[in-house]
Amino acid sequence: MNLFVETLGQGPDVVMLHGWGLHGGVFARVAEQLATRFCVHLVDLPGHGASPALPRFDADAVADLLAAHFPLPAQVVGWSLGGLIAQHWAARHPDKVKSLALVATSPRFVRDETWPHAQARASIEAVAQSLDGAFEQTLERFLALQMMGAPSARDTLKALRGELFSHGRPQGLLPALGLLLEADARALAGRIQCPAALFYGARDAITPIGAGRWLAESLPDAVLYEFPQASHAPFLSHEQDFVRALAEHLETQA
């Protein structure tokens, strides 16, 4: 399977994995700033952007696909769904992942009695049920939910909307949403040995900061960066602070 990948800059390899419903272009501004020091690869995950869909969006299969596409050791940045895939990649291919930067992500995206750091299942199911009949409106509502609570939500949401279909109409969002409903990667934490930097917004309703604190305690070598005023996309709402912290992490682990 051919993944759509945009590459910027030269230097140590950094692979960036986006969240559900979007594509690699969401990281364009961050990547441009990193490209003076790194070779940055912006991936469209299967079924997103310009990458073809898989019949079943399986986290292990996608991680294996990425490991084959990027055979040299790389640092991996994953946001939300991309962060879940990054955890699987690091656990399954420890020789291919030099470090992780996990942004507003979680090992589990559904709240239950054992995991309070997530949305109710019904919230994700409602998105899935409305995709067929109101595709664009559903994605825009989901974007608005991601920005809820951030002080610059209006400007950040405008930037996200501008990127939404710039790589074409995505073809495989429902299977990826199915993964978010069923995923539970908590057992992977003990298998991830590479250094990790964790970036979380205190106002995030999709992946509450408790998920980041759990990862900080469970991963063997992790540093947590909390953005008190940020929501689900600190790399957009607090771009300069985010880039500064991410670049420091990447340079330390290069």
From Swiss-Prot:
The keyword Cytoplasm applies. It comes from the Bacteria. It catalyses: 6-carboxyhexanoyl-[ACP] methyl ester + H2O = 6-carboxyhexanoyl-[ACP] + methanol + H(+). Pfam families: Abhydrolase_1. One of its GO terms (molecular function) is pimelyl-[acyl-carrier protein] methyl ester esterase activity. It is found in: Cytoplasm. Substrate binds at W20, S80, L81, F142, L143, A144, L145, Q146, H232. The active site is at S80 (nucleophile), D204, H232. Monomer. PANTHER family: HYDROLASE ALPHA/BETA FOLD FAMILY, PIMELOYL-[ACYL-CARRIER PROTEIN] METHYL ESTER ESTERASE. Belongs to the AB hydrolase superfamily. Carboxylesterase BioH family. The physiological role of BioH is to remove the methyl group introduced by BioC when the pimeloyl moiety is complete. It allows to synthesize pimeloyl-ACP via the fatty acid synthetic pathway through the hydrolysis of the ester bonds of pimeloyl-ACP esters. This is Pimeloyl-[acyl-carrier protein] methyl ester esterase. It comes from Chromobacterium violaceum (strain ATCC 12472 / DSM 30191 / JCM 1249 / CCUG 213 / NBRC 12614 / NCIMB 9131 / NCTC 9757 / MK). The gene is bioH.
